[in-house]
Amino acid sequence: MITIPESDLVVHPLCLGSNIFGGAAPEAESHLVMDAYRSHGGNFIDTADMYNQWIEGHVGGESESVIGSWMKSRGNRADMVIATKVSKLDRRPGLSAKNIVAACEESLDRLQTDYIDLYYSHSDDETVSLEETLGAYAQLIAEGKVRYIAASNFTPARVRESIEFSEDNNL
């Protein structure tokens, strides 16, 4: 097991990606995959609100729903570290505060949990100020809905800017 730097999240070194759960891998098969992963010590699952929206008849969120039903049926939420992402869902893109908060609530419902361990900005949104985006995350952390945040598909300069802003503003 390893600890994610700057956190108390202790995770298996292999994170299980779930972008096909609820799509190419139906729910029952996805549950079997997660059971096998868990039986080998796995505890870290990555998903996103937009996963499976590219499949006809899907709207996104299917992967989160499958993970939520699995955790509920196994009673293992406290043993798992769940990472999910916001900003690339077609029907609600971006990193505005309103979108982040709404997307978080929907992800919590689909995941059948009251907190997200690691909440990613799935891609940058330079049309929204860092103050607004990071302020929304700070609110969710203060409310206990999110434990830690992360960024995916950001330039190194934008990551540096985000870190500096957070440090300067005690976020």
Segments from the language model and where they lie:
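N-terminal binding-site loop/beta-alpha segment at the start of enzyme catalytic domains
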Residues: 1-80, 142
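A short, structured active-site edge motif that brings together acidic residues
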Residues: 78-90
